[in-house]
């Protein structure tokens, strides 16, 4: 039986990366519910794409296992794809979820949704569509938006001045400090790129820090010592 790795969180908020992806197939309702059923997780992270017919689905890569390119494929075709479980066997319930299904799971279980905007070229009107879907579920207050495109995070900040928004980055550049502080945007950074000095400096300026993707208890302990606010993980609990 697969199981999580237990740690002493000491108040750090754990985010289940693509759902509880260390146990269930990533970015499926099964993975979301596996995380939702565990009190240890503050939030559930996922990735959103727009299909060719204007639906919003959750998947990490831009192609599903059949090779279909999500932005150029209609929803019904994507939904018909049956994914494999962790053991390599197909499981009929493992299908590409929709954004509204994910939001409902987060809302029903009282978890924060951490939603990565995957398409850097996504027009502002499509960002509004994503926001409207979440509003229709009456759960905008329960969502954190994240993304590697600072421009897209700025777009969301302008549309939703009070929303929690995190800029994703593989690395640290000195110019990020002013960018984040000036625009009220938090940092979601690959853990190896975060120094203790920068963590303290960001916190003093009111910027929250999320690190990804940390699956080592020893590494987590180090960054908990830095005072990070969130740890995104596949398996730590």
Task: Describe each model-derived feature in a short phrase.
Residues 1-237:
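Phosphate-group recognition and catalysis centered on beta-loop-alpha active-site segments
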């Amino acid at each position: 039986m697969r199981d999580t790795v237990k740690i002493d969180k000491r108040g750090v908020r754990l985010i289940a990366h693509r759902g509880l992806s260390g146990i269930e197939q990533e970015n499926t309702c099964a993975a979301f519910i596996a995380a939702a059923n565990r009190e240890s997780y503050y939030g559930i992270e996922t990735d959103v794409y727009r299909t060719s017919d204007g639906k919003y689905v959750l998947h990490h890569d831009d192609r599903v296992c059949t090779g279909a390119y999500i932005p150029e494929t209609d929803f019904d075709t994507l939904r018909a794809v049956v994914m494999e479980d962790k053991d390599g066997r197909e499981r009929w319930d493992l299908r590409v979820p929709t954004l509204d299904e994910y939001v409902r799971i987060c809302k029903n279980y009282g978890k924060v949704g951490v939603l990565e905007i995957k398409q850097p070229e996504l027009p502002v009107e499509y960002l509004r569509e994503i926001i409207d879907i979440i509003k229709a579920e009456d759960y905008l207050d329960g969502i954190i938006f994240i993304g590697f495109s600072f421009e897209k995070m700025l777009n969301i900040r302008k549309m939703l001045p009070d929303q929690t928004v995190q800029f994703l980055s593989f690395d640290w550049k000195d110019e990020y400090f002013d960018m984040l502080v000036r625009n009220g945007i938090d940092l979601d950074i690959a853990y190896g790129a975060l120094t203790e000095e920068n963590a303290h400096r960001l916190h003093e300026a009111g910027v929250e820090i999320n690190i990804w993707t940390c699956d080592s208890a020893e590494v987590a302990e180090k960054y908990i010592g830095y005072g990070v606010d969130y740890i995104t993980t596949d398996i730590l609990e």
